[in-house]
Amino acid sequence: MKMDCFSPRSAVAVAALLALLFAGCETKKQASQPGGSQYGKATSTASEGSGEAGTGAVSTASSAKEKFGSVSFTGQVKVTGAPPAPVELDTSAKPECGKQRQAFEQGTLSAENLVVGADGGLKDCIVFISKGLKGYKAKDMVTYGHPAKVVIDQKGCQYIPHVFAVMADQEVVIKNSDPFLHNVSIPSLGFNLSMPSVGEENRARFFNRKTGSQVCQCSVHPWMNAYAYVVKNPFFSKTGGDGKFTINKLPDADGTYTVEVWHEKDRKLKAPKAQKITVKDGAVVEGNIVFEFTYKG
């Protein structure tokens, strides 16, 4: 039987063909692996800032830094003059209140409308950035160290807290910790919620119609009141018993902002003027900020 044999020239041609096929498979294998493409190295380099993609990454980081900064400033709100000491409130007309306060170990109830510390520090002021910052929403509150929800409790015939700040559209939880009737009335908003016993209610988009101060009242217990101050951004602070405050996370970029202070007794206190602060090189130029009310009697 006759058999065909390869010529040397045919063998060379077959070897060349096999080499081409093998090279093609290797190229395909590399392209299927992360970073194995012939463009993989260029893409990685760009993400590190050497190309167009890198420029985009730097820009995004810069934008985030603008919004979520690290600048903070401190200060104090003080009172000059001779403000009176807080008076004890008479709750004898509602004996259930005294019993409930004993049960909660709250002690006697004193007026909270003008509480001044030993060195003149004024409690329960809202200090806030009024100009220079825009575009913040209620969802940003947690990012800036504030609670996602504001809680108002009716406990021992007293609103707790007495003063609070809230952003428009922020969720509010209204609680009644007492086993008897209370109500939360906010005349400026046309709002009135009766709560006959222990319980709570969530109210979304509660303070969504007005900015500034809103008084909360209980018509059952007329001495009960609290104040909400509706702010436009999360850059605010409430003063403690020493009148001191801290506002955190201002943008790192250079800028100028207006700072104001609010207190419920503005009618008997000559309010201080707004102040401007300047951020430069990641710090507040003015340092510690002092607001000074004057008590008029």
Give a label for each model feature:
Residues 2-13:
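Bacterial N-terminal signal peptides that target proteins for export
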Residues 13-21:
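Bacterial N-terminal signal peptides
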Residues 25-297:
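Extracytoplasmic copper-binding redox domains, predominantly the cupredoxin/blue-copper superfamily
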Residues 4, 23-24:
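Coiled-coil-like amphipathic alpha-helices with heptad-repeat character
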